[in-house]
Amino acid sequence: MRNLKLHQTLEFRDIQAPGKPQCFCLRAEQGTVLIGSERGLTEVDPVKKEVKTEISLVAEGFLPEDGSGCIVGIQDLLDQESVCVATASGDVIVCNVSTQQLECVGNVASGISVMSWSPDQELLLLATAQQTLIMMTRDYEVITEQQIHQDDFGEGKFITVGWGSKDTQFHGSEGRPITFPVQMHESALSWDDHRPQITWRGDGQFFAVSVVCSQTGARKIRVWNREFALQSTSESVPGLGPSLAWKPSGSLIASTQDKPNQQDVVFFEKNGLLHGYFTLPFLKDEVKVNDLLWNADSSVLAVWLEDLPKEGSSTLKSYVQLWTVGNYHWYLKQSLPFSTTGKNQIVSLLWDPVTPGRLHVLCQGWRYLCCDWHWTTDRSSGNSADDLANVAVIDGNKVLVTVFQRTVTPPPMCTYRLLIPHPVNQVMSSAHLGNDLAVLDASNQISVYKCDDKPDMDSTVKLGAVGGTGFKVPLRTPHLEKRYRIQFGNKEEEEDVSPLQFRFLTWIEGDAFLAISHSHSSPQSIIHHLTMAGSEGDEEQGQLNVSSSVTVDGVVIGLCCCSKTKSSAVQLADGQVLKYLWESPSSAVEPWKNSEGRPVRFARPCTQMEAAAIGGEECVLGLTDRCRFFINDTEVASNITSFAVCDDFLLVTTHSHTCQCFSLSGASLKMLQAGLCGSQVPSGEILRKVERGSRIVTVVPQDTKLILQMPRGNLEVVHHRALVLAQIRKWLDKLMFKEAFECMRKLRINLNLIHDHNPKVFLENVETFIKQIDSVNHLNLFFTELKEEDVTKTMYPPPVTKSVQVSTNPDGKKVDLICDAMRVAMETINPRKFCLSILTSHVKKTTPELDIVLQKVHELQGKIPFVPESVSAEEALKYLLLLVDVNELFNHSLGTYDFDLVLMVAEKSQKDPKEYLPFLNTLKKMETNYQRFTIDKYLKRYEKALGHLSKCGPEYFTECLNLIKDKNLYKEALKLYRPDSPQYQAVSVAYGEHLVQELLYEPAGLVFARCGAHEKALEAFLACGSWQQALCMAAQLQMAKDKVAGLARTLAGKLVEQRKHSEAATVLEQYALDYEEAVLLLLEGSAWEEALRLVYKYDRVDIIETSVKPSILEAQKNYMDFLDSQTATFIRHKNRLKVVRELKSQRPRVHVDHEVAHGRETDLFSETSSIRSGSEMSGRYSHSNSRISARSSKNRRKAERKKHSLKEGSPLEGLALLEALSEVVQSIEKLKDEVHAILKVLFLFEFEEQARELQRAFESTLQLMGTALPDIWTLTGQQSSSTPVLGPSSTVNSIMASYQQQKTCVPVLDAWACLPPKIDQRSQWKLSLLE
């Protein structure tokens, strides 16, 4: 559904050269045109408008001086830097244009009719006047010569036994004679010049020759291969014309045929059989076809026609028509009229071999015209709310309009057709009213069609794919308002212009147009502002007058208008973009500037250009024919095949067969560039896959439809997720819930978006939502899709972050909140109509309220539905069975203890009555409480079952106690009985025994104690070491003193095992009355002062000499050994860490990936403990047996959990060293209180030297560690491992090593090792008396 649009014309008038032009060729590398005349060759530069070279063939004797000579062909030879020329007299001349040297490389005595080079310029084919073909090499050596007329069909002759042919068919009463009709041959057309025509296939493997048969006088087409072997001869086609063109893609050979009432362009296959045709818009004998030409990519067929002279016709014209095909229909896209006399008479025309859309035309008056055509889609602007998404397709004198908002009609069909008197060259829609159309035809008239409420159909408007008897048109069709003729300033200038004087006709407002014309004398363009003016003589004929004109330096190749900003962007051939200010009092142009104030210039000329606002900035978007996409002067992508701007969205299709949609309102240039160039992965809302080769036709405004066209011509409608969600959000903002719901249901958008888009607004308008939907099925569908997930954060995040809304439900129970709100609204509106939806609201809650649902169904039973909208109990129950599993529903009904409800549910289910009736009958015979107990136990509702069973009486207590033990219901059971009851006593004892089995001795003791089971409580407290409670129980049991003393010694032993020496000493002193053993336990636990208190309390000063002082001195020695060991370990690890860091900074990090980052091999290495075992410092009464040995076991357990090894050269040795150093510092830090305590008793017993020695050693160790901490835990050292090394001095290896190093960064679990340990400087551990 594309049209051909003229982007640029290049014209060179009045070329100063001798003679009259006869033919021409293109010199692509030089950018010049070589024209042949009866005098010689002339090379012109159409851009600079100058004659570069003139070569006379008359002076060399190749052409006669009387001007009767003729050049039949010119071919530029690229690799030889020369030109091959053939004359009608038979000379084949090679001409070096730069040196003007001529060389005759061959001569045909009989003369040459046609010269044709193969596409690869390896073979030369000459048709002579003696009806022969001569094939030569590129070196002009004759390969072979054959007669044009061949009796044989060719190598591709069909082999058949005749089945299905005319010879074997029955012909009715006429008999057999009709089977063999007389072959009738029509002679060639009267205007046929009888010259042979030669055309090559695009790959140069075959060529076809059209020649007038010497026997029949009719034209035939013969196909030869590259080896000059005849392949096939065409079937006899009456009225076959001389024109011949082989499609470069190789599928068809085009020619013409005169039929009794029409003239067709027909197509032959390589085997000579006809394969399709299309009819030219002329009557028989009205025109003749001079030539057919395919463009380079086989997409356009140019037909050069000329009026045949008739009586009474003084003005004859010639036409160049451009035809394209789609969906097997041929469209006439352009019709360019030329004169057949004077300077505008066409001599020859050629398609450019490099640029597919460039057509070169040579006219008789030494005029050269070059037209660049590009594909465009003429669609409505889509800016107004009532825009119908019209797309107009040019087809000769018809404009095929498809209204995509109402129907998707595949081409070549359409919604309606506009009939124009002359072939259409351009169609445009109004920038403000997209349904209004203006059509420019080949006679430079503009037909304006407007859509209004007129009931009558216009005679020039015909319905297309719709219609019929009684059919009512569901849309407003346009009517012809008036036709306007563009008025020129000079009548002579009007007759002496190129066929398309005005280009880029743009309808900017109701009565104003913009158009572009070019200057013939200089590279300038003129922007015309055209306004409508009525005609006094004819109401149906108006005029377009030029109200103002602005001259622009440069060739304009693009013009677009933005209706929102009323800005017009003008693109020049050099890529510069200008802004045309047509609303200003004096029309002017200025450079289009970007946000930085720099003029915008495309790097390459763009064939499609549009203006749009991106993030509030007005930008120009351009797409080149090489798929490069620009926004202002920035190339954002190089794989874009088509794009369209609709509302606030930019849609593009790419070479990777995707369609991407971007919101422009909150977008930026960098974001679009990142999304299009693939530097960031587009979200699912932005990107969707499309069929290979899809191109955007249009986007339906205020809708979700995106129309794509496939390469073969068929259409596909897709609903791009971004467009869908944007439209749904608009509907929800306007409280148009029904439209949003229908769209979401049809396109399978999660219905949670209705609430999540704006929860507060939805909950405030629940009644509006229900009234608009007004369908029980649709409401139920909405309920079934509800979930706690916020889809605006997961599935459908908004393109622009919206303002944070206060949560309407801080507990996160979204589903419950919606169900409750909608249920209240439905019960208010019409509870009978929405009965099923109300039931669904109960079922869909987080905890389904099946009991309430069953109760409501039970209430419906027995009611007669008088109202038509009411629902019976049976219908409600059937519906519930769709939502809930039948077994679950049966169980819930059983849990209501209502057997009528249970039977109703069971009857509607698939259950066998033999299964449930005996069970229900058994239950009915039971006592009420026991019945409910049995039901709850069956339903595994054990707490309720226990409650009912406890009410059944003492005779059921044994069963009750078994239930309590089986289901661990002790806490619930204790709430059901009085504390003074025997049942409470029995449950408590069972509970305590259960806790003992679980090794929870202290809670078990408390339970036993509360219920009076003191002996069991004593055992439990004794097992857990709770000596206070154990002694309390002993008192309540009134135990004898000796038993109490034995109990105390047992408790003391357990406390010692738990390293609670002070508490063990208290028990021995107060309950076992053994103060001596108590003192020894205190000395073992380093409680020096408490031990002295007992010594003096019981006046046993002798113990000081025998036990206290030796223990103190032993402890001091152990402390000194421990400090020496830890200091040496600290220094050794610190020095090794320094070495490790130096090696790490020196060695390359290229192979770091091969290291074991997670310590998988560390189990193979031996671990080195940094703390000595307690046995090295043990003494009989020293604290090392308790505290230091406990620390050693703790370190061993920690070492077992460590992943890092201290072995030299291990992968993470540095981290292991940090861990070891941190442990040393922490162990020293924890000794401060202990050192302070022993310093006091050392001073007390006059061991001042030992005390000072210990104090100095401890202070020295602390200073050593405090000084080394900043060097060990350095900030730069930690950052260097994770910061990539970048910069001008970096290399590939260094950058890779830096990034690979980040892979081995410290795991989260080991991050504590990178933090320096804390040393409390405020701790007062010193003894000032020793200083």
Swiss-Prot record:
Its assembly, as annotated, is: Homodimer; dimerization promotes ELP1 stability and elongator complex formation. Component of the elongator complex which consists of ELP1, ELP2, ELP3, ELP4, ELP5 and ELP6. Interacts preferentially with MAP3K14/NIK followed by IKK-alpha and IKK-beta.
* Compositional bias segments (type: Polar residues): 1167-1176
Q: Where is the composition biased (Basic residues)?
A: 1193-1205
Protein family per UniProt:
Belongs to the ELP1/IKA1 family.
List the top taxonomic levels of the source.
Eukaryota, Metazoa, Chordata, Craniata, Vertebrata
Q: Please list where the region (Required for binding to tRNA) is annotated.
A: 1190-1208
User: Which PANTHER family is this protein grouped with?
Assistant: ELONGATOR COMPLEX PROTEIN 1
Task: From the UniProt record, report the name of the gene that encodes this protein.
Answer: Elp1
Per UniProt, the keywords (alphabetical) are:
Cytoplasm, Nucleus, Phosphoprotein, tRNA processing
Q: How is it modified after translation?
A: Phosphorylated.
**Organism, scientific name:** Rattus norvegicus (Rat)
Q: Where in the cell is it found?
A: Cytoplasm; Nucleus
The residues that cross the membrane are none
Q: Single GO cellular component annotation?
A: nucleus
Using the record, list the residue span of the signal peptide; answer none if the entry has no such feature: none
Enumerate the GO terms in the molecular function aspect: ATP binding; protein kinase activity; tRNA binding
**Record protein name field:** Elongator complex protein 1
